[in-house]
Amino acid sequence: MVTVKNILFDKDASESSKYLGNLPEWDLNDLYTNTQSPELEADLNWLEKECKLFADEFQGKLVDLSASEFLDCVKRNEKISNVSGRLISYAGLRYYQCTTDGERTKFLSDIQEKITIYSSSLIFFNLELNRLPDKHLDELYPQNEELSRYKPVFDKIRALQPYQLSDELEKLLHDMGVVGDA
């Protein structure tokens, strides 16, 4: 196991600093082997393309989807979320191992920016989902048992409906995430 010296004062990483001892370093290989790994690049490329495809295929069309098509849409959105989560988890955990490392800070910032840009085309999903009449969703659930398992997720999203802003403001707030994280 690789260990990292735990420094009392993060701003002074010199050998003369007082150490609290050695701490274990996270093994992030289950996520990605390194910042240049082909898997990481493949996930970033896939995410960029899939976000665009998802928006092209489903934006403005949720109300017209059959139960099985709606399930496909939800599963694709879920996969996008999982890949995004994997990317940001790797970048974040790597950064938190050594917050004074400029390269790690830049890598985290770059990943955050890419995910924010790629996912901006997905803002429509929750907004459209919240515009669907309750009756519409209630009619879809009995048609597809697997889709009905997502009802608690939809209920949680729809509970925020009273606080939903216009599409333009929601997109602006999403895009401000890049600036806010800088």
Language-model region placement:
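A well-structured
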Residues: 1-182
